[in-house]
Amino acid sequence: MVYGLNVKPEHGYYVKVNPLDGDISRIEVVDQTPDGGLSFINGMRGASTMGRAVKLAFVPTRMQWADRNRHPIPDFASSWILNVSTRAKNLIEEFEPRVHQFLPVDYCNIDGLALESRWFLIVCNRIDSVDRNHSRMRLAKGVMWTSTDVENPKLVFSEEQARGYHLWRDKHLIHGPFISDILADRIQMEGLTGFYGTRADSV
């Protein structure tokens, strides 16, 4: 089974987060070799969602978690760039060691006091995981799955194509990332916060 790795606010509202250094608009993907999928987008949040490692030059190393109610940061958070706690990092690396890019980032609270050392998570599996025979979607220009002009659209993942992967980006989809049911189950069993897994259709 396949799940979308979504992030939810733990206390009913999204917290404003401010980069304190770096320049997210200038972050670039390291290897931009075409692979038949989506073109590689640099800057803002694009580079961090392409399924390949990013250059470190402009990645922030300090962020402010501006929660006036002073709640802790969940294990999974999506502010600017998907970021995780050390607990979440260790669990992911238990399944896929030395695969993904974990970039250290220090968070402070609204008063500027140290809050937590965390990790930007750059997913580094970029695969084609959609089942073409069972999906009712259009592969626009042979590059991106879209439901535009499709009657009763349906996206179905291939368990065969995703076999052996636990965390990935699909090279033909603008959303994601996606995770295996095994990893989703462990995240929930360990009680990691901020995670909201949505089960996707798969065959």
Task: Name each region found by the language model.
Residues M1-V203:
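Phosphate/anion-contacting hairpin/loop surfaces
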